[in-house]
């Protein structure tokens, strides 16, 4: 019994030895199979037989491991073992890691050159030698094992020993650029049919959408826009790359490319109503297409100084998405930085195009790769950009001390902040911190660099901030040549001051300047002799009316006349019936603009007023006489039109036809001419109680002139109501005379006649209406030059008839209504007297129905 276990143990030991020996001999018996394996196996070292594990890829299946799950070893079909599942999954993971590794270094690694025949033979012989050599003296590492290590530890990078960390970082950055480049390349590789279809879809959008206009080119560089405008009069609109949300008008005039910035502001018309306006010099528009139509249609110069006229749009032939990708690629690949700059790698522009805003900088400022070559000494590339980029706040100051934005009133209705730079007392090169209030909160304080200035601008440099000192002290050779592609030199929208700079430097800067002084400085800009820049002229307070009845000379009315002479009334009726409503509206508008000092303002008148335009004078204390004159003209115009209607003693059809023409006149004044003053006067005549009670006349109007009745009831009356309540206003680009009646009535309420409850008289919304009109007055005062320009455009080429101009003059109307004697009476007496006359005329045409007759 004792010998049996020993014999069994000996047999077991012998079997174990033979089994292990046979397993260890497997690689030698299958050497031919190993010779046909991949060439990469030649670097695999051959350790001792009992110490090394065999490769799964090139050996026969080994015995199953000691511990195995049933799901790994046996299938659901039977008990057949399947030990290769884990190995197949591991092999797939290794192959996937290998593909990822190859893609990540696709750009940085150079592809090996294809070997020739001799090299292939040598490689084959070397492979056989390595396969036969099993000594542990091999030095190279198995690439498959390297990939396995990569999959286990993903955070550990395999860096060759001869490659520096800087090179590896550059390769990784280049790999990121390659991914971004592929995205842009996908856009550029679109088929022409797809691009053409996309362009058609953009052009089919609403006309108010900027993308629907072919002259809009989106975000293209400044240099590209200059190459697109080739002939005088060519123009295009592009996005401002330095001021987010603004646009730039690029045109060519006198063989020179000019750039004009279009500022976007938010105008607060009421407490809860705001709308966006686009300011351009002294003009304001609802949208950019309206600005383009205005300048192209009127052939008005874009700026007074340059005299540039735009009339030939440069249309785009590709969609906006394609243009941005195309010019972005060309810009990023063409610009190279100095070797010392960390952002000088190729493709860095495309990598950083995805940045939208960094510390107030727009994309173009961040993506510059040729900024400061010595920026490696700074802690972060963003600091170098902050110190070397141009500030939009200082670009206008390099040209003129008066920025176009500086004209905007200090009103919460405007999003831009008034920027006034007082002249320094003595020229100084020391750095002084600038006030943070002098710039917009969304714009950083940046270094202007050594931007070249026009001649004579060296003594007008703005105060430098600490960042300015840092940038000026930098010995960078390329700093002087730095120029932002979009923020460069915008053309001046205001003429430069021609006064003596020495006197301006010697004077003490005033801390606060009123509206009159500021506008007087604007007035001085256009003076050739510079006399107004030396002394200040006190405005003259007018005490007498501009309507001088004593010196009035007329071709239609005699020197002495009685009120409402029949022959004179008949003559006026004939003159009004000879022309259409539009011609009448032009005559009325011309006289209105002359009275309100929108047109015909001379330099002497501006000196006496202290301001440039009558619209600003209306809001000032010494403009009281002008306010009274406008109130006189408004009521006199309404009464004369009412007399014209009530004096028609013919049939109801004749009065209805005259009523229809009056409605057409109101529509022309509102729409075609943009004259809200006379529009309100005509509507005031139609809404008089003496006219609105003529039921037969209005019934005939609805039957014979239905469109006129609908126009009056559905459009004109609601529009006038919204004007009086301060809820709605006409577009500034189409306005020649704004609706000034509410606020001049508020300012002169003790002198205005009582005509019933006003919109601001209600207890519910009275205060809101008053505030809306007072804020509208500030807007009116600010846009006096715009109304002047619009009036000149509307009346350009207009040949007025002297008789009609005289009929619509206030002196003629006063003489016609009250005679030569009564015209000099008090205003209250005249209005009260004529109210009774109008009531009598109305009852004569359509007597009131008595209660006994019902």
Curated annotation (Swiss-Prot):
Impact reported for residue 787 to E: Abolishes interaction with NEDD9. Abolishes interaction with BCAR1. Abolishes phosphorylation of NEDD9. Abolishes promotion of migration and adhesion in T cells
Keyword Phosphoprotein attributed: yes
Its membrane topology: Peripheral membrane protein
Compositionally biased spans, kind Basic and acidic residues: 99-124, 508-520
An example Gene Ontology molecular-function term: phosphotyrosine residue binding
Domain Ras-GEF: 580-848
Keywords of this entry: Cell membrane, Cell projection, Cytoplasm, Membrane, Phosphoprotein, SH2 domain
Gene Ontology biological process: signal transduction; small GTPase-mediated signal transduction
Region feature Disordered, mapped onto this chain: 34-129, 330-384, 398-417, 422-520
Domain SH2 residues, every copy: 215-314
Main subcellular localisation: cytoplasm
Residues bearing the modification Phosphotyrosine: 273, 278, 787
Domain of life according to the entry: Eukaryota
Described purpose of this protein according to its UniProt entry: Acts as an adapter protein that mediates cell signaling pathways involved in cellular functions such as cell adhesion and migration, tissue organization, and the regulation of the immune response. Plays a role in integrin-mediated cell adhesion through BCAR1-CRK-RAPGEF1 signaling and activation of the small GTPase RAP1. Promotes cell migration and invasion through the extracellular matrix. Required for marginal zone B-cell development and thymus-independent type 2 immune responses.
Domain remark from Swiss-Prot or TrEMBL: The C-terminal Cdc25-homology/Ras-GEF domain adopts a closed conformation rendering it incapable of carrying out canonical exchange factor function, this closed conformation is required for interaction with BCAR1.
Subunit field text: Component of a complex comprised of SH2D3C, BCAR1/CAS, and CRK. Within the complex, interacts with CRK and (via C-terminus) with BCAR1/CAS (via C-terminus). Interacts with NEDD9/HEF1. Interacts with EPHB2.
Record-given protein name: SH2 domain-containing protein 3C
Organism: Mus musculus (Mouse)
């Amino acid at each position: 019994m004792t010998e049996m276990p020993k014999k069994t143990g000996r047999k077991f030991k012998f079997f174990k030895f033979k089994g292990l020996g046979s397993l260890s001999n497997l690689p030698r018996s299958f050497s031919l199979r190993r010779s046909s394996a991949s060439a990469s196996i030649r670097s695999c070292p051959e350790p001792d037989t009992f110490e090394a594990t065999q490769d799964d890829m090139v050996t026969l299946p080994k015995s199953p491991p000691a511990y195995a799950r049933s799901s790994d070893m046996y299938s659901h079909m039977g008990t057949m073992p399947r030990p290769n599942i884990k190995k197949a999954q591991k092999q797939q993971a290794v192959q996937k890691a290998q593909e990822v590794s190859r893609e990540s270094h696709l750009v940085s690694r150079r592809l090996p050159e294809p070997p020739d025949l001799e090299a292939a033979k040598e490689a084959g012989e070397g492979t056989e030698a390595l396969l036969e050599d099993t000594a542990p003296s091999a030095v190279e590492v198995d690439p498959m094992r390297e990939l396995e290590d990569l999959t286990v530890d993903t955070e550990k990078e395999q860096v060759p020993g001869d490659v520096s960390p800087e090179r590896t970082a550059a390769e990784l950055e280049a790999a990121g650029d390659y991914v971004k480049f592929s995205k842009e390349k996908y856009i550029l590789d679109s088929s022409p049919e797809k691009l053409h279809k996309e362009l058609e879809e953009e052009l089919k959008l609403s006309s108010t959408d900027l993308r629907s206009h072919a002259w809009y080119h989106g975000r293209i560089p400044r240099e590209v826009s200059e190459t697109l405008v080739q002939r005088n009069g060519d123009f295009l609109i592009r996005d401002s790359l330095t001021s987010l949300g603004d646009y730039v008008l690029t045109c060519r005039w006198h063989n020179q490319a000019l750039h004009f910035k279009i500022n976007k502001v938010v105008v607060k018309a009421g407490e809860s109503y705001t709308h966006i306006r686009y300011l351009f010099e002294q003009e304001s528009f609802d949208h950019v297409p309206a600005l383009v139509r205005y300048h192209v249609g009127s052939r008005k110069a874009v700026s007074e100084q340059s005299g540039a006229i735009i009339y030939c749009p440069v249309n785009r032939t590709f969609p906006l998405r394609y243009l941005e990708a195309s010019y972005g690629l060309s810009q990023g690949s063409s610009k190279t930085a100095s070797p010392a700059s960390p952002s000088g790698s190729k493709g860095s522009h495309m990598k950083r195009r995805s940045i939208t805003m960094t510390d107030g900088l727009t994309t173009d400022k961040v993506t510059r790769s040729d900024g400061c070559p010595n920026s490696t000494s700074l802690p972060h590339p963003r600091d170098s950009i902050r110190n070397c980029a141009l500030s939009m706040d200082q670009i206008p100051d390099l040209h003129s001390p008066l920025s176009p934005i500086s004209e905007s009133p200090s009103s919460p209705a405007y999003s831009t902040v008034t920027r006034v730079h007082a002249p320094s007392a003595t020229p100084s090169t020391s750095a002084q911190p600038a006030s943070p209030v002098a710039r917009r909160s969304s714009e950083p304080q940046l270094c202007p660099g050594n931007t070249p200035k026009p001649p004579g601008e060296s003594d007008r440099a703005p105060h430098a901030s600490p960042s300015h000192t840092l940038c000026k002290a930098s010995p960078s050779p390329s700093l002087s040549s730095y120029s932002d592609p979009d923020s460069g030199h915008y053309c001046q929208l205001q003429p430069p001051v021609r006064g003596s700079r020495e006197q301006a430097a010697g004077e003490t800067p005033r801390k606060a300047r009123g509206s009159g002084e500021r506008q007087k400085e604007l007035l001085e800009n256009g003076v050739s002799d510079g006399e107004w820049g030396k002394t200040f002229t006190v405005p003259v307070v007018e005490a007498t009316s501009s309507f001088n009845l004593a010196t009035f000379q007329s071709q239609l009315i005699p020197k002495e006349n009685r009120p409402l002479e029949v022959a004179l009334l008949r003559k006026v009726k004939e003159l009004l019936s000879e022309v259409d409503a539009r011609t009448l509206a032009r005559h009325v508008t011309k006289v209105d603009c002359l009275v309100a000092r929108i047109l015909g303002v001379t330099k002497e008148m501006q000196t006496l007023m202290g301001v440039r335009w009558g619209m600003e004078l209306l809001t000032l204390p010494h403009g009281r006489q002008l306010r009274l004159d406008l109130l006189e003209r408004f009521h006199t115009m309404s009464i004369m039109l009412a007399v014209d209607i009530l004096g028609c003693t013919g049939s109801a059809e004749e009065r209805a036809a005259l009523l229809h023409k009056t409605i057409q006149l109101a529509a022309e004044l509102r729409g075609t001419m943009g004259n809200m003053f006379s529009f309100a006067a005509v509507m005031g005549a139609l809404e008089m109680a003496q006219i609105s009670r003529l039921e037969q006349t209005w019934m005939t109007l609805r039957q014979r002139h239905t469109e006129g009745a609908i126009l009056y009831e559905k459009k004109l009356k609601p529009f006038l109501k919204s004007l009086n309540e301060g809820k709605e206003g006409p577009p500034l680009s189409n306005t020649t005379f704004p609706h000034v009646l509410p606020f001049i009535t508020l300012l002169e309420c003790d002198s205005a006649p009582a005509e019933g409850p006003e919109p601001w008289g209600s207890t519910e919304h009275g205060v809101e209406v008053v505030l809306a009109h007072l804020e509208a007055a500030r807007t009116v005062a600010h846009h006096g030059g715009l109304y002047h320009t619009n009036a000149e455009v509307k009346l350009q080429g207009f040949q007025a008839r002297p008789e009609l101009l005289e009929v619509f003059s206030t002196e003629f109307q006063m003489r016609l209504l009250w005679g030569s004697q009564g015209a000099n009476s008090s205003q209250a007496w005249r209005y009260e007297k004529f109210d009774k006359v109008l009531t009598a005329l109305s009852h004569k045409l359509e007597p009131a129905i008595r209660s006994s007759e019902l």
